[in-house]
Amino acid sequence: MDKTTHFGYKTVAESEKAGKVAEVFHSVASKYDVMNDLMSGGLHRVWKHFTLTTSGVRAGDKVLDIAGGTGDLSRGWAKRVGKTGEVWLTDINSSMLTVGRDRLLDEGVILPVSLADAEKLPFPDNYFDAVSVAFGLRNMTHKDAALKEMCRVLKPGGKLFVLEFSKVWKPLSPFYDFYSFKALPIMGKLVANDADSYQYLAESIRMHPDQETLKQMMLDAGFGKVDYHNLTGGVVALHKGVKF
């Protein structure tokens, strides 16, 4: 019998989740950047900038951007590593990857792009100085397997940056719940003509491990040290793991 997992609040067979997540992102790819700005009031740019500026990534480094989507972090990494470095933009969703590749090319940013499953990364052991995954981990079926793969491809001393929605500060919960479950689907319907995908977004955030649970998952995956920073009252958290 097939094992089950969650897709938002629904229980589905593990073998079905990836396909259902793919449908969501095929649907929203063309409006993804517009919706990110609208939903977060532009704050997603601040969160990503914080990730980049506190990373310690420098010229010549090799960086893997997992679930990189439309390329926000990849563009930032490319600027930091310069011509002597190497940045890979990867995503499991071809629609998102196409939008990201085309957007980067339009901006004159040329870097390798790969359609890749985070649970089975097509890269050698101990290759990258840094790995990032922004707003992608919660959509993965086997998060533990994906985290182990991220650890595998990092060099000793390399860092993993997980930027993801997390458990919000308790006094903000009533407003945040109203916004997530009432406003987001309406915005999704009006802007992207897809309320269901943004209902899934709200549900997937609530089902994602909280800050301390994710920290322990990263330690269990092989990272020697893990810290996290809450951003915007815990709406988002940036976890940093170091491979020893």
Curated annotation (Swiss-Prot):
PANTHER family referenced in this protein's UniProt entry, alphabetically: 2-METHOXY-6-POLYPRENYL-1,4-BENZOQUINOL METHYLASE, MITOCHONDRIAL, METHYLTRANSFERASE
One GO BP: methylation
Family membership: Belongs to the class I-like SAM-binding methyltransferase superfamily. MenG/UbiE family.
Lineage per the UniProt record: Bacteria, Pseudomonadati, Pseudomonadota, Betaproteobacteria, Neisseriales
Lineage top rank: taxon: Bacteria
Pathway linked to the protein: Quinol/quinone metabolism; menaquinone biosynthesis; menaquinol from 1,4-dihydroxy-2-naphthoate: step 2/2; Cofactor biosynthesis; ubiquinone biosynthesis
Disulfide bond positions: none
Transmembrane segments: none
EC number(s) recorded for this UniProt protein: 2.1.1.163, 2.1.1.201
Keywords annotated in UniProt: Menaquinone biosynthesis, Methyltransferase, S-adenosyl-L-methionine, Transferase, Ubiquinone biosynthesis
NCBIfam families with a match to the protein in the record: MenG_MenH_UbiE (TIGR01934), PRK00216.1-1 (NF001240), PRK00216.1-5 (NF001244)
Sites where the protein binds S-adenosyl-L-methionine: 70, 91, 117-118
Enzyme class, broadest EC rank: transferase
Record's function text: Methyltransferase required for the conversion of demethylmenaquinol (DMKH2) to menaquinol (MKH2) and the conversion of 2-polyprenyl-6-methoxy-1,4-benzoquinol (DDMQH2) to 2-polyprenyl-3-methyl-6-methoxy-1,4-benzoquinol (DMQH2).
Catalytic reaction annotation: a 2-demethylmenaquinol + S-adenosyl-L-methionine = a menaquinol + S-adenosyl-L-homocysteine + H(+); a 2-methoxy-6-(all-trans-polyprenyl)benzene-1,4-diol + S-adenosyl-L-methionine = a 5-methoxy-2-methyl-3-(all-trans-polyprenyl)benzene-1,4-diol + S-adenosyl-L-homocysteine + H(+)
Transcription as UniProt keyword: no
MF-aspect GO terms: 2-methoxy-6-polyprenyl-1,4-benzoquinol methyltransferase activity; demethylmenaquinone methyltransferase activity
Stated name of the protein: Ubiquinone/menaquinone biosynthesis C-methyltransferase UbiE
